[in-house]
Amino acid sequence: MLVSSSFASSIDSVMSHETMSLRRNPPFIDTPEKMPNPTASPNGTIHHLIDPSLPLLSSTTSSSRSTLSSTLNSPPPPPLTTSYSSYNSSACQSITSSPTDNTALAHNSKCYFPHSLSPTPLSSNSSSHVILPPISSFTNLITVAEREFNGRSNSLHANFTSPVPRTVLDHHRHELTFCNPNNTTGFKTITPSPPTQHQSILPTAVDNVPRSKSVSSLPVSGFPPLIVKQQQQQQLNSSSSASALPSIHSPLTNEHTSRYSSSLKDSAKITKQRKKKECPICHNFYANLSTHKSTHLTPEDRPHKCPICQRGFARNNDLIRHKKRHWKDEFMQIYARESDNNSGADDQDDTARTSANNDSDDSNDKLAASSSSEETKLLKKNQLKSLYKIKGAFKCPYNSTLINLDMEVYPHKSRSLYFEPINCHQTGVFSRCDTFKNHLKALHFEYPPKTKKEDRGVVPGKCKHCGLQFPNVDVWLNKHVGKGCGYSYH
């Protein structure tokens, strides 16, 4: 039997009132146990849904009441089957949408129910009444609404700069994929990244959501929609500002800088090596090929020749080292000449002495002893002269014996000295430069008391002969010895 137009208008008015009150306060729903018996009072089925303060049904005429009673007693239309799954999905979308959408839905639809169908009346043997959806469905709607309200209030004090946990992000991506399975190809695979790059993960997952659905309309449990939107905006701003700045701290830039600095240090420490050339005779490579070629020549044809033995050498240093070997021969030659001259003079003295003192044996013994001592002194003097005349030898400028010998050989250099010479060495002549310098540092420079041998090069001191102070022994040796102090040989 068809429902009359007056009954339909009454139902629409009641449902519109309940719809308008639902946005302000939670809906008041009675359980089936509290509902009156429909068989005892047919009109009671509608009265428990109507607010007595509204003059909606109180102003209706008696004809409307009779029409309503006759309609309730009529057989109900065939039941329409609806699925609670479609109801739940529609209810979730309607509740989590914006208030503007709720208002438009309340004004455009005839009945503000979670599903677009009218309440399903159930038939019975005696009478029929309207059965609303289960109370558990409305409880879910109320829970979602309270969660959205609490999320908006808590978002004022939320810290949006904190990183999003990876577990929540994976759950969020799973929910996005579950709610929109047709757009799974738009998601990008998020690879693990360092902790400093976690800010770029959330915008990648949220930007792929279709623009028809906002983030707040997606059912993400435990993640307030407003917080997701604000975090998305903040992450987008941070990513755009980071992309605008030059990446001066990128691993590539740091690696390039470190390699460039290390190459500069290596080039500063290592000098440029000379290019080696191949010898045409032995086919070996040498940096100084011209010097090496002289080694293939015979000793007579080499450029540096010894003036004594006429032996040739490829390098001048080899010639200097070779000349020192001739010092012994030169010393013996000089000593032989000096001894011959002195022996001739001694022979003349001996003949005069023997002719004058033939009668006294004691005097002969004394003359023999004196002659032996004089010969020893003369021998040493001749040896010193022979060493003194060797060219290239290093002579101590403070040796008293060598200074007196030089003044004797060159009388015009005899003068008073402004320093006190000492007998520091037996001869005062050295064949090697390092030995000569070690002699000067050890015997002619005064160090502070208790100075260790390894500290002599850094401690200050003074000259033993003139008393001048110097910061270290090297300054004294290079700027004072032989220039400001000491004897200059001929």
Curated annotation (Swiss-Prot):
Keyword ATP-binding set for record: no
Region (Disordered): 1-85, 231-273, 338-375
GO cellular component: cytoplasm; mitochondrion; nucleus
Sites of Phosphoserine modification: S153, S155
Residue ranges with Polar residues bias: 250-265
InterPro entries in UniProt: Znf_C2H2_sf, Znf_C2H2_type
Name used for this protein in its record: Zinc finger protein STP4
Note: Present with 623 molecules/cell in log phase SD medium.
Stretches annotated zinc finger (C2H2-type): 304-326
Keyword Secreted: no
Location in or out of the cell: Cytoplasm; Mitochondrion; Nucleus
Keywords per UniProt: Cytoplasm, Metal-binding, Mitochondrion, Nucleus, Phosphoprotein, Zinc, Zinc-finger
GO molecular function terms attached to this record: sequence-specific DNA binding; zinc ion binding
Low complexity bias (residue ranges): 1-16, 52-73, 231-247
